[in-house]
Amino acid sequence: ITASSVDELEWKCAEMKKLLLSQDMDVQPCSFCQEQAFLSSLPLVSLERSLFERSKRNVLTLGAASCYPFTSYEMCDDNGILLGVNKHNNSLIIVDIFDSRVYKNANIAILGTSGAGKSFSMQLMATRMRRKGIQVFIVAPLKGHEFHRACSNIGGEFIQISPASQNCINVMAIRKVDRSVDEMLDGPGVEKSLLAAKIQRLHIFFSLLIPDMNHEERQLLDDALIRTYARLGITHDNSTLDDPDHPGQYRTMPVLGDLYEVLKESPDTKRLANILNRLVNGSARTFNQQTNVSLDNKYTVLDISELTGDLLTVGMFVALDFVWDKAKENRTEEKAIFIDECWQLIGANSNRLAAEFVLEIFKIIRGYGG
């Protein structure tokens, strides 16, 4: 405080004391103590006793913490799974992605360079979720063998889909889904044609199999699909799905071979039939049979790494479609779908319809406990 006279200086000091006292701050004069104050500010761990007595105050721990110039970040959810150790402060990273109080949804994207450990991190999360009782599905389009040992050791189901495998998922099957939980929670819903929904997804399948299919061929394919199901007594009326000889079960579903026979009948769909012949009578005829695998196991791996070229994205879609039907059965149970190498379906050169299907799962799986 400076002034041009002693009286002015005393007045300014008095006003300053009033101002500080109004803000609950005590003021003590430290005349001729500049040297001691300077030495106390140096990192000498030395504080003048008289200055300490005048300047000391009691501070709550919360206030003292605010003076600490560092912040320690950590993720430690109450009921999560251990992912690793924070390399910055050595704290454990424990995450519960299903905790809606902390996270808006449970979706996770694992990104990294080649060899960074993306597949390992995914498998680590999957096995630890399984130990917590969460149902896990893994779709492995590449390096499926990496998941086999862990799957076997925890009693999981390893399903290999390839031309040389005996496992098969009938892409044309309309699968019976238990909707009792949905009806209990929401009441009876509006009945929708299951055949129409299935044909819509089959259009995605054939757009992956035949990328250059034009609009006319899509319409002809749509008519052929409806006629194929009609020959087995299945129409847009959902009651026609029930098997009269086996109550509570669906009818025997058509396979690709049935559609192939319908496509051969018209010269306009001859090209589609010729392309489909590979999956019916050719090297990939393993797709032309009824479904012989189950997804009831709590830890299921679908290995499609033996499929190459255009069949890889086709097989990936078939596996994902199968898993998605199973995941929608009971939305009160927690479940996780892991898609390794997801860029195969949503990358820049991928099929638009397939990418939209993956996006749909990504957006609404939260409503089904995933």
Question: What are these model-predicted stretches?
Answer:
Residues 25-26, 36-93, 143-144, 150-156, ...:
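P-loop NTPase motor domains
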Residues 107-109, 137, 301:
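Short hydrophobic/aromatic beta-strand immediately N-terminal to the Walker A/P-loop
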Residues 1-9, 113-116, 305-308:
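A generic structural motif
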Residues 127-137, 154-156:
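Post-Walker A helix-loop "phosphate-sensing" segment adjacent to the P-loop in P-loop NTPases
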Residues 1-37:
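Conserved ASCE P-loop ATPase motor domains encompassing nucleic-acid-directed helicases/translocases
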Residues 12-16, 106-109, 121-126, 146, ...:
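Short, hydrophobic/aromatic alpha-helical segments in well-folded domains
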